[in-house]
Structure formats: structure tokens, C-alpha cells
Regions:
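Helix-to-beta-strand junctions that scaffold the AdoMet/dcAdoMet cofactor pocket
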Residues: 138-139, 152-154
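Conserved N-terminal segment of class I S-adenosyl-L-methionine
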Residues: 1-128, 132, 145-146, 161, ...
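Short "lid" loop at the C-terminus of a central beta-strand within the Rossmann-like core
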Residues: 163-168, 184
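Active-site micro-motifs of SAM-dependent methyltransferase domains
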Residues: 115, 136, 165
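Short acidic, glycine/proline-rich loop/turn micro-motifs
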Residues: 170-174
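Conserved beta-strand signature within the Rossmann-like core of class I S-adenosyl-L-methionine
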Residues: 155-163
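A short SAM/SAH-binding and catalytic strip from SAM-dependent methyltransferases
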Residues: 130-140
């Protein structure tokens, strides 16, 4: 049995065992928060994980990649005031969203444990945080979402983009489970659980995008 890394419940059950060329993995669904996770024994080591990320085509100049990121950025940008300061959490080897936000006149810093690992960045507080195609790599999503919440100023917004499942019975056929760096999988119900646990509001303005809002007066 494997404890849920989001809500820490033991009420989980295995929904799939893969047999990909990179090795077999087990996937467990939590009955409490609806997260599917891969147990730690199947996680890649740091060197293998970083090498996998370097295979991604995240060129900041790629118009198709920018179009992809704009699904989240356009929603976040529409809610920002002039002078808003932001953080791109999990910025990756090609921090395209940092380039896009900077071009739109916003101050934004990158943070990534492999590619922009300056921990001093995490000592600040931000008006907005973007987290694109990163949450699926969280090994301890309960801890990591709490960290994101703590990095937001009161009244701030957190934009998360990750593929979400509408039907876990289809999980074995979902291409998303084939990437060995993907170890946490979400539904809307999962992210609603996150928002409730952190006393935030959340809505889903477009496919695979969640916008969390921290109250102006923190409860």
C-alpha cells in the first residue's frame, strides 16, 4: 500500500500497472482527494529526471509552444495590475513564460530545482505565480502546493496548467502516464480539494487550466 502524497490518506487503491520500455510502474488513486500518484520507489533519480527534461522542446521563440502556454498566461495576465510581480515555478530549461510575461511588461522571476535553482527567490512573496506543466512532476504535492500558497501575497493568484482526467477508468489508455517523470495526476476534484485545504478559491477557465485565488484577508 502507498500513502497519498497530497492528503496523506491510506485510502488508496491501484488502478493501473504499466509495462513501458523504461520499466513497470504502479499507479494509485486516492479515494479522499482523487489524486493518482506513482510511489517513490518508481521515481527517477535526479540525473535521469534532468536528462529527460532536456529532451523537451521548450524553445521560448517557438510560436506553437507560446500558443500552448498562452492558454494559461492570457487568463492570468487579464487579472494583473500594472507593476504586479510574479514567479514562474518550474520554469524548465527554456523559460518561455518568463519571456512572455516580461514582454508584456511584468517583472517575473524563474525558479526551477534543476535549471534556475536560486533558493533566495523563494524568500520573496509574489502577486502571481505560474506553474505550467509542473504539478505532474511533484513528488510531494501536499508540501509543494502549501509552498506555492505561502509564496503568494494576500489577494494573489496562482495559475496551474496540467492535464486533468475526467474519467480515471480511462487512465490505462492515457498517454500522459507514459512519461516516467509524471508521478502525480489530477482531476478537477483533486484541485478543488487543494483549494479547500488551503482556503483558496479555484475555477477552471479553460481545458487543463486552474486559477487559484488567495483571499485578500488570509483566513
Amino acid at each position: 500500500m502507498s500513502q497519498c502524497p497530497l492528503c496523506h490518506s491510506w485510502d488508496v487503491h491501484r488502478i493501473h500497472t504499466s509495462s513501458e520500455r523504461l520499466g513497470s510502474r504502479e499507479f494509485f488513486l486516492c479515494s479522499v482527494c482523487d489524486l493518482v500518484h506513482v510511489p517513490a520507489r518508481y521515481h527517477l533519480d535526479n540525473d535521469a529526471e534532468k536528462a529527460r527534461y532536456l529532451l523537451h522542446n521548450n524553445d521560448p521563440a517557438d510560436p506553437e509552444y507560446r500558443k500552448f502556454l498562452s492558454r494559461l498566461w492570457n487568463v492570468v495576465r487579464a487579472e494583473l495590475s500594472s507593476g504586479a510581480q510574479g514567479l514562474d515555478f518550474g520554469s524548465g530549461p527554456g523559460p518561455a513564460l518568463v519571456h512572455m510575461a516580461t514582454e508584456d511588461g511584468f517583472d517575473i522571476l524563474p525558479y526551477d530545482p534543476y535549471f534556475a535553482p536560486d533558493q533566495s527567490v523563494l524568500e520573496s512573496r509574489f502577486d502571481f505565480i505560474t506553474c505550467t506543466e509542473t504539478a505532474e512532476h511533484f513528488s510531494s504535492p501536499g508540501t509543494e502546493f502549501k509552498q506555492l500558497h505561502s509564496l503568494l501575497k494576500a489577494g494573489g493568484i496562482l495559475g496551474v496548467m496540467t492535464s486533468m482526467s475526467a474519467d480515471w477508468s480511462q487512465f490505462p489508455n492515457w498517454h500522459y502516464n507514459r512519461d516516467p517523470t509524471h508521478i502525480a495526476y489530477y482531476s478537477r476534484r483533486t484541485l478543488e480539494w487543494v483549494s479547500d485545504s488551503l482556503h483558496m478559491e479555484v475555477d477552471f477557465p479553460t481545458a487543463n487550466v486552474a486559477i487559484f485565488r488567495k483571499p485578500s484577508e488570509v483566513r
